[in-house]
Curated annotation (Swiss-Prot):
Record feature DNA-binding region, as residue ranges: 275-308
Species this protein is from: Corynebacterium glutamicum (strain R)
Family of this protein: Belongs to the WhiA family.
NCBIfam families linked: DNA_bind_WhiA
Protein name according to UniProt: Probable cell division protein WhiA
Lineage: Bacteria, Bacillati, Actinomycetota, Actinomycetes, Mycobacteriales
The protein's role, per its UniProt record: Involved in cell division and chromosome segregation.
HAMAP family: HTH_type_WhiA
Amino acid sequence: MSLTSDIKQELAQVHVAKNSVRAAEVSAILRFAGEMQAVGGKLVIEANLDSMQVGMRLQEFIQGLYNSRVDVHTVNPTVSRKTPRYLVRIIDNADEIARRTGLVTRSGHVVKGLAPSVVSGTISDAEAAWRGAFLANGSLSDPGRSSSLEVLCPGQESALALVGCARRIGIAAKTKDSRGFDRVNVRDAEAIGALLTRMGAQKTRIMWEEKRLKRESRTPANRLANFDDANLRRSARAAVAAAARVERAMKILGDDVPEHLAEAGQLRVQHRQASLEELGRLADPQMTKDAVAGRIRRLLTMADKRAEDLKIPDTNSVVTEDLLEEI
C-alpha cells in the first residue's frame, strides 16, 4: 500500500465530534473532489473519490449534518484506469447542502474558493479543511530530494484558500501551476510531518519519518559514488577528518568529556560522512547544524589544550593523507 493510501485510510478513521469541524471537512471534500450539475431540472452534487472508506465517511457526515440521503457507487476499473473509483452522489436536498457547505452563496452564485465559514473558522476548521482536501485529491511522495505533500486543486481560488488554511496552522505551503492544473504543495520535511499530525495521520507520519531518516543515513555514502562533484567530495573529506579528530579527542580526554560534548562527538564518529545538518536531525533532541558544529569545536579545542599540556599528539595528528585518500 502506498503512503498516500495509508494516510487516507488513517484520516478516514479520525474521530470528529464537533459539527462545525465535520462541516469544514465535508465542504473541502466537495470543493476539491466534487462537481455540481443540473439533471432533469434538479441540482446533483457528485464527489469522485479513490477510497471507499472516504466515500463512506462523506456519506455518514452529510447524512448526520443535513439529514439527506447520500448514495455511494463503485465505478469499476477500465483499461486506462487500473483501480476503482467511488462516486458519492447527493440528490436529496442538494440545493440546501450546496449553500450550507459554501459551494454556492445564498443567492446561488458559485463560490470558487473555500467557504467563508471555513476560511475564517477555528484552527480545528483549518485542520479539517486540509484533511478534507487531502482525502479528496491529495498525495504524498516517498521521502527524498523531491518529496512533497501535494493537493490537486479545482482552481487558483481554492488553492490560495488552502494555502491560507495552512498558514493559520503554522505550515508553509505554496501554490504552483503544473501541466495546466493548480496545485498546493508542502516540500519541507518538517512541515510535511507537522501537517500530517495536524490532519490526524500521526501513525503514517511516524512511518514517513522512519523512511526519511533511513534514507538520509544512507545518502552520504551514496553521494560519494559521484566523484564529479568536487564540492561534495571536499565536504565528505572534511567530515571524515572531523570524525577522526573527534575520535582522538575522546581518547585524550577520557572520562573528562562533558556529556553534551560527548553526545555530539559520538554522532560525528558514528556518522562519519554525514553533514552537520544531518547530524542535527539525528540528535535527540534534534539540534541545529550550528549547535552541532559548536559542540564539536569546543570538544576539539579542549582536547588539543589537554594534549599540549601533556605533550602528546593533538587531534590534528590523526588527519593523514592515507585517511583522506580513502574518500
